[in-house]
């Protein structure tokens, strides 16, 4: 609180003669609100700079990577926006007007956090940033290798606990979350204390995508988030005694485009061997493609839309100008809906996606319908019996 603010407070503390008591109380309340929000609040109304305190029964967790597409999101559903692009005060104000939290991205080198003093400094820096930007918490996104016997194993759990304690203490109603792989079984050599981290934060965002990051079988193109494999990951988290209410299902709004070394008549696409963290093949042989691009390309494909009944995922084949065959795997409302049923059956905390910018918000009639269908599928369904 700056000195001019203090002087201003003292001036109104002595009631001038003739001012009705209720009017004075209202004035004091307004000034207190402005002081609490800060004089540099960028929002049209100062109360929009106050942190969100409400905790929804069902979480819809949105990752936003920048620009202004957020203006076209389905705000009737959104509960949290994790900002992984440049900070946008307009987004913060608008999200708060809709009762949605806006949280920071948290990333740090695991080698550094072994030092408790470094952890304290990092947390203080992030907390100060959240306060000055009127944000509601932090999403910790650390996808680095950790050896089970290394000092980083315990340091990471300590970082999450200390971050949660600090944010909860300093920002009322704040939220601290942690991103985990689709399975707790040391995916990409990430040996984390998943139960300890889940206990230490508000909830885990399970990244149920990039599930071909380590291909141990045939080097062929496959679904980004195969149905059975995805749900097995959640079963494994729950078997570790992690409360389902600590799990948010993350779904992909993008796919993978693979160049086929060979494309068989029964649509098996052999891909180049690109090793990753010990595995002989990986989805690094392909490139990520947003849903909006996929929807534009599918009509000009050589196969049309195809469906894999085992992986319960859509895909298609196309031929590029150089004559090479490609296979594209992705998720659509049908595949997402099948997986989302698990959320209600096992009472997970909610759903989210990477990332909301992947849809077409141009206003084109066909694109608009496709975009609405992707948002619609996030809504909780009736419990399956």
UniProtKB/Swiss-Prot annotation:
It is an enzyme of class 3 (hydrolase). Keywords: Glycoprotein, Glycosidase, Hydrolase, Lysosome, Signal. The keyword Hydrolase applies. Its EC number is 3.2.1.-. GO terms for biological process: chitin catabolic process; oligosaccharide catabolic process. It is found in: Lysosome. It comes from the Eukaryota. Residues 39-385 form the GH18 domain. The active site is at residue 143. InterPro entries: Chitinase_II/V-like_cat, Chitinase_insertion_sf, DIAC_cat, GH18_Domain-Containing, Glyco_hydro18_cat, Glyco_hydro_18_chit_AS, Glycoside_hydrolase_SF. Belongs to the glycosyl hydrolase 18 family. Involved in the degradation of asparagine-linked glycoproteins. Hydrolyze of N-acetyl-beta-D-glucosamine (1-4)N-acetylglucosamine chitobiose core from the reducing end of the bond, it requires prior cleavage by glycosylasparaginase. This is Di-N-acetylchitobiase.
């Amino acid at each position: 609180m700056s000195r001019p603010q203090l002087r201003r407070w003292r001036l109104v503390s002595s009631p001038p003669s003739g001012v009705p008591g209720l009017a004075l109380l209202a004035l004091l309340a307004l000034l207190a609100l402005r002081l609490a929000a800060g004089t540099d609040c960028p929002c049209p109304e100062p109360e929009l700079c106050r942190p969100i305190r409400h905790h929804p029964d069902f979480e819809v967790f949105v990752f936003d990577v920048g620009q202004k597409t957020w203006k076209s999101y389905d705000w009737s559903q959104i509960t949290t926006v994790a900002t992984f692009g440049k900070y946008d005060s307009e987004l913060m104000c608008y999200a708060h007007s809709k009762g949605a939290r806006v949280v920071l991205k948290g990333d740090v080198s695991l080698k550094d956090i072994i030092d408790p003093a470094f952890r304290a400094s990092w947390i203080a820096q992030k907390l100060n940033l959240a306060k000055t930007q009127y944000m509601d918490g932090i999403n910790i996104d650390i996808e680095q290798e950790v050896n089970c016997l290394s000092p980083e194993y315990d340091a990471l759990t300590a970082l999450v606990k200390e971050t949660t304690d600090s944010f909860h203490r300093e920002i009322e109603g704040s939220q601290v979350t942690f991103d985990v792989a689709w399975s707790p079984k040391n995916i990409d050599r990430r040996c984390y204390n998943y139960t300890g981290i889940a206990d230490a934060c508000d909830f885990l965002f399970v990244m149920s995508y990039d599930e071909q990051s380590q291909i141990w079988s045939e080097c062929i193109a496959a679904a980004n988030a195969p149905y059975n494999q995805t749900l097995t990951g959640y079963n494994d988290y729950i078997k570790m005694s992690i409360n389902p209410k600590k799990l948010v299902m993350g779904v992909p709004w993008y796919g993978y485009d693979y160049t086929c070394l060979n494309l068989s008549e029964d649509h098996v696409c052999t891909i180049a061997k690109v090793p990753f963290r010990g595995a002989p093949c990986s989805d690094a042989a392909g490139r990520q493609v947003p849903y909006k691009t996929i929807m534009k390309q599918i009509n000009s494909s050589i196969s049309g839309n195809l469906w894999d009944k085992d992986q319960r995922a859509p895909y298609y084949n196309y031929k590029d100008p150089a004559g090479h065959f490609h296979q594209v795997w992705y998720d659509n409302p049908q595949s997402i809906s099948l997986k989302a049923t698990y959320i209600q059956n096992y009472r997970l905390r909610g759903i989210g996606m990477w990332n909301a910018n992947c849809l077409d918000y141009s206003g084109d009639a066909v694109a608009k319908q496709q975009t609405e269908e992707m948002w619609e599928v996030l809504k909780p369904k009736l419990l399956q019996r």
